[in-house]
Amino acid sequence: MLENKSVKEIISLIKTKEASIKEVVVFYLERIKKYNPSLNAIVSIKEEEQIINEAKHKDEKFDESKPLFGLPLASKDLLDVVGFPTTCGFPGYKDYFPKKNSIIVDRQIDAGGIMIGKTNTAELGVGAHTANRLFGITPNVYGNTQSSGGSSGGAGVAVAAELLPFADGTDMMGSCRTPAAYANVYGFRPTPGLLPDYRTNDKKKNLPIISTPGCLARTPDDMAILLDVIAGEHKEDPISFSLTNSFKDTNIRDQEFSKIKIGWLSDMNGNYQYDPELVEMCNKQLDSLEKNKIIIEYLKPKI
């Protein structure tokens, strides 16, 4: 009943009582038990009994005002979740248990989500492939001899395999976008500050601001539901900001396409070598976008 359903559809089933929260949680837990041993996407997880008890409690204390009410969630193992170690995939951090949640983790829990575990990451969040000495490799969801990308490969694979409805991540140089592309899902690296993080008020120590929380989802509509929960200003992030509109209610009208600008790096001014067929495919798509009045800015950074 729940397989291939969008998050919006699952939320609707919960609200109309066509599916209990326990049923939704069990659906995802069964998929985790079946597929995660080979995918290694979720690397820390609560005891099943504890998760199901949380689901039963939410069924009893139903609150449809909370947008993620009853959805099982897992955060990237670079983000802090109380009760789980934040290991970053690094053996030296295997016993580090945070005393408070990351901001976007708190927001998911406050919105009714059930935090069940942590998703795998490249070691210390650095790398184009998701592998580390603590938990090992997360392979591609479509074949275990291919890469899942990095560093949010656990999240990308978990979302693609329907082990999670959607997932948070972090992105510095493609860490949400690359795993999403490799898993045929959507990945988003927002403007730094849209998704808040605990940062120092010393602006000199924040520059350059490269890394930011991000997210992954199977559809843009699913992602909008998560973004509406985790985006927005926070007093402990000096660069954070809020938007006036809801992501769910935002549509780009035809007349607004001419205002969209895309920066294209290509081979980074000759510093990176890519497969010529890949570059040709991208250039064809850029030509198509330009014909639709989208502005393409061809960038040649000095590296």
What do the predicted segments below correspond to?
Residues 1-46, 50-53, 291-293:
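An N-terminal boundary/leader segment
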Residues 10-16, 74, 92-96, 211-218:
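Short, well-ordered beta-strand elements within core beta-sheets of diverse protein domains
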Residues 21-25, 56, 248, 274-301:
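Acyltransferase
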Residues 35, 67-104:
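Enzymes and membrane/adaptor proteins characterized by extended Gly/Ser/Thr/Asp/Glu-rich
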Residues 48-68, 75, 94, 98, ...:
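Flexible, acidic active-site loops/lids enriched in D/E/S/T/G that coordinate Mg2+ and/or position polar
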Residues 68, 235-241, 290-302:
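Flexible, glycine/charged-enriched surface loops at secondary-structure junctions
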Residues 101-230:
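Short glycine/serine-rich loop segments
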Residues 189-280:
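A short helix-breaking turn/cap at a secondary-structure junction
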